[in-house]
């Protein structure tokens, strides 16, 4: 008999989790594709360090703001906005690459903007989960989210190499853009979510975890 994790028996969390599973794999695909892309653009090792800087600085700057907003505004709506923004940025990266207009500045700029979006998305996501499952299933829900993140970190790099070899660099970014639709569709399908404004339930600490699932 197949055991279904308790959190996945709740429809709205199930939608979100499967959407995140797809999206996180797409984000990891893009991350490793960017590393490879930079290697093809320059032989300077420091250029790779620039990606890390572009990913972490915006989160340090905006994480507390993102946490405060997640405590007061509609978290589902925040995620709809941030996920759409992340998809559009990935699409821009794909288009610039396909048109041959890509360079290090564009890569850093888009990476930084995606990190800004993640600084608002991550705390909203953490705060949304308690509205989707009862308190008794919260530990299981957060464990499943960690599993989704780690699965993406394993699957993403392998898929990225395969797509680059078979289709080209720009298609990795395009696939990532499409992967965000999985979360957007999940958020739409779950409908309105009742939530209480509970100041202090989301902290900057949750937002400062970008390298796990940064889109």
Describe the residue ranges of each PLM region.
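Alpha-helical transmembrane-bundle signature of multi-pass membrane transport and export proteins
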Residues: 1-215
């Amino acid at each position: 008999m197949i055991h279904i994790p308790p959190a996945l028996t709740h429809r709205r969390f199930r939608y979100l989790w499967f959407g995140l599973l797809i999206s996180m794999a797409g984000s990891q695909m893009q991350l490793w594709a960017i590393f490879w892309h930079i290697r093809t653009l320059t032989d300077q090792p420091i250029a790779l360090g620039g990606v890390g800087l572009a990913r972490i600085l915006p989160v340090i700057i905006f994480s507390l703001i993102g946490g405060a907003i997640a405590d007061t505004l509609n978290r589902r709506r925040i995620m709809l906005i941030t996920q759409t923004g992340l998809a559009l940025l990935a699409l821009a990266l794909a288009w610039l690459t396909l048109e041959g207009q890509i360079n290090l500045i564009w890569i850093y700029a888009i990476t930084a903007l995606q990190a800004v979006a993640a600084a608002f998305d991550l705390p909203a996501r953490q705060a949304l989960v308690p509205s989707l499952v009862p308190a008794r299933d919260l530990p299981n829900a957060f464990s499943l989210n960690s599993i989704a993140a780690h699965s993406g970190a394993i699957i993403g790099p392998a898929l990225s190499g395969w797509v680059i070899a078979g289709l080209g660099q720009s298609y990795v970014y395009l696939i990532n853009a499409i992967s965000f639709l999985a979360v957007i569709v999940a958020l739409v399908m779950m409908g309105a979510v009742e939530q209480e404004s509970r100041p202090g339930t989301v902290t900057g600490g949750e937002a400062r975890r970008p390298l796990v699932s940064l889109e």
